[in-house]
Amino acid sequence: MKKYRLKDIATVEISGVDKKVKESEMTVRLCNFTDVYYNWAITRGKHDSFMTATASQKEISRFLLKKGQVALTKDSETRFDIGIATYIANDFEDVILGYHCALITPDETKALGCYLNAFLRSEMSRKYFANSASGSGQRYTLSVQTIEDMPILLPPIEEQKRIGELFTNIDRKIEINRAINHNLATPDRSLGAEAVHCAAYPTIRFQIRFPSAY
């Protein structure tokens, strides 16, 4: 693997798009902090769940979500809730990134967003962001420089693609299981707890370990 700084392989922009509705602006949907925080990937299927707001044409041009990008949480009440990444899996026509988040656009000749998303969610990256956050007490934040200086380990593009596809396939299966569980009929309580447990899917956890970057 080759070692880079994030700024050497991607651009980083900080969104300041708020949730207000202004008559002079265009209607959009916002991908907000919680959308980034709770999703491995942002897919077209989530479009209708994004809140409606407005934004200027300049904001739309800068923060419109495009396939291959990565969004990152930038500000939060605890240092452990910042630096959480999500992969933008589809192109969107009217969904832009909301404030308290950063938008990372990789140079795809060097790095793929699906791999960056996995790397930024690694234990090593989480420790980097937690230790580099500024603030204390009520609010923690990541500066643009801190995000840009993040050490990144890159394998060849083909290997990045395989790693990204592995995580994407797992995320899809998890989403399918969630949808199945959501649509299951409420169990008859008279059947007892055992019947409820039979309907549950086991939790599968695994980890890819990246060598130390620093």
Q: What residue ranges belong to the model's regions?
A:
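A short beta-sheet element
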Residues: N32-T34, T52-T54, E59-R121
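A short glycine-rich beta-alpha junction/loop motif
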Residues: D94-A102, S134-G164
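Short, positively charged
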Residues: C114-T146
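Short, well-ordered beta-strand elements within core beta-sheets of diverse protein domains
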Residues: A53-S56, A102-E108, E148-L154, T168, ...
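Sequence-specific dsDNA recognition surfaces
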Residues: K7-E23, T34-V70, Y214
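Residues that recognize and position ribonucleotide moieties
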Residues: K2, R29, V95, A118, ...
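Non-catalytic DNA-recognition/assembly elements of restriction-modification systems
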Residues: M1-V17, D149-A195, I204-Y214
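Short coil/turn segments at secondary-structure boundaries
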Residues: K19-M26, R44-K46, N131-A133, F206-I208
